[in-house]
Amino acid sequence: MATSRLNASCRFPASRRLDCESYVSLRAKTVTIRYVRTIAAPRRHLVRRANEDQTLVVNVVAAAGEKPERRYPREPNGFVEEMRFVVMKIHPRDQVKEGKSDSNDLVSTWNFTIEGYLKFLVDSKLVFETLERIINESAIQAYAGLKNTGLERAENLSRDLEWFKEQGYEIPESMVPGKAYSQYLKNIAEKDPPAFICHFYNINFAHSAGGRMIGTKVAEKILDNKELEFYKWDGQLSELLQNVSEELNKVAELWTREEKNHCLEETEKSFKFYWEIFRYLLS
């Protein structure tokens, strides 16, 4: 017996400039992820109880003895690959390789300022502090394996801001974008772990890729090639990212398909929030 195929659909502009900005997980394009409902897996129920004796009907195709088709992009490779699939719809694969991008030439035309960069660093510090505090203090099991991953940035940012202060620069207070993102993370952390995990993934993995490329350009233009602590990690970054990916996959294994889809759909919000902070670099 046939069933409907589940497909992911993402819509976004095709402009080269927008591709560059979204590559660093900053420009908030509208991304809509839809999965067609099926008899066996409706939008809000992964499986249905067939009767009172708790028999599970998982898939009509399987019930008919046929091999079920794969329904979600990258699902066999783990949930992190599903998240990457959604992000890659916004910035192509060939632009996300160790912080390098064909967009380098475009970024080189941006006019960075110390004042704008400090605002960016201050708000980024607030977001990372919030993210790390939630993970360290929460009793939610899904966050337990995300402590002390080596990706933490708040302490590094504190050292960077202290360096700027020693150079005679005035450090600004946190601005509205940083405060808004911080508060949103606090609001969803306890009641919506899948959504929070989406932000954790996008914040850390975007900074490890596009964020490093931006940091290099800023250093070249206005910091006399000074490499900030924000862009340094203890150990091999690739190994740190791999360890976190494995942990996120373990967390997602306990989720229903509904919860996984909800996590993927949160990607748009993470882009919107971080874009507001990134705009300081362009002002």
From Swiss-Prot:
Q: Which domain of life is it from?
A: Eukaryota
Q: Mostly located where?
A: plastid
User: Cellular component terms, GO, for this chain's entry?
Assistant: chloroplast
InterPro entries, per database record: Haem_Oase, Haem_Oase-like, Haem_Oase-like_multi-hlx, Haem_Oase_decyc_pln
- Influence of pH: Optimum pH is 7.2.
Q: What is its EC number?
A: 1.14.14.18
Any one GO molecular function term: heme oxygenase (decyclizing) activity
GO biological processes: heme oxidation; photosynthesis
Localization per Swiss-Prot or TrEMBL: Plastid, Chloroplast
Knockout-associated phenotype: No visible phenotype under normal growth conditions.
List residues binding heme b.
Answer: 91
Q: Which UniProt keywords apply?
A: Chloroplast, Heme, Iron, Metal-binding, Oxidoreductase, Photosynthesis, Plastid, Transit peptide
- Keyword Coiled coil listed? The answer is no
Cite the record's tissue specificity text.
Answer: Widely expressed at low levels.
Family, according to the entry, reads as follows:
Belongs to the heme oxygenase family.
Its function, per the record, reads:
Catalyzes the opening of the heme ring to form the open-chain tetrapyrrole biliverdin IX with the release of iron and carbon monoxide (CO). Produces specifically the biliverdin IX-alpha isomer. Plays a minor role in phytochrome assembly and photomorphogenesis.
The record's annotation in PANTHER family points to: HEME OXYGENASE 1, CHLOROPLASTIC-RELATED
Q: What is this protein called?
A: Heme oxygenase 4, chloroplastic
